[in-house]
């Protein structure tokens, strides 16, 4: 069995037919390793992530997660496959409580399973556990980012 968790196999992608950003891009990310995308502005780092997370469909080539082809899958379908994305910046629903923000991350889980997963994830974020019923917009920037990461971990 392969230890590759993410594979790009000769992927071609861009934002218009005349603007190719990824040209025959091949990369592997292996389980248990840390993989960094490093490069100057415009090198394609964000395009790789948008392609991986279903925000951009490759024109050719294959993107695989745990050996399964995921080209063209919508972000919601990728959630069901166990792929979550915590983008830079703040991505919480301010008027909702921390608890409701967390529940949104578990949208693919059954209600009973969701409660158990939320409790499990909250053990990793004790400060968020204390403030889980507060409105997310009243949390500090760091707490909001913890909330977002916790939401992604609910998968």
Task: Name the predicted role of every residue range.
Residues 53:
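Helix-to-loop junction immediately C-terminal to a conserved catalytic motif
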Residues 135-139, 143:
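Conserved ABC ATPase signature
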Residues 61-70, 81, 114-116, 120:
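Conserved ABC transporter NBD signature motif
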Residues 38-40:
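The feature captures the beta-strand-to-loop junction immediately N-terminal to the Walker
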Residues 15-17, 35, 73, 98-116, ...:
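ABC-type ATPase nucleotide-binding domains, specifically the catalytic core motifs of the NBD
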Residues 152-153:
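ABC ATPase C-loop
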Residues 6, 21-22:
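Conserved structural motif at the start of ABC-family nucleotide-binding domains
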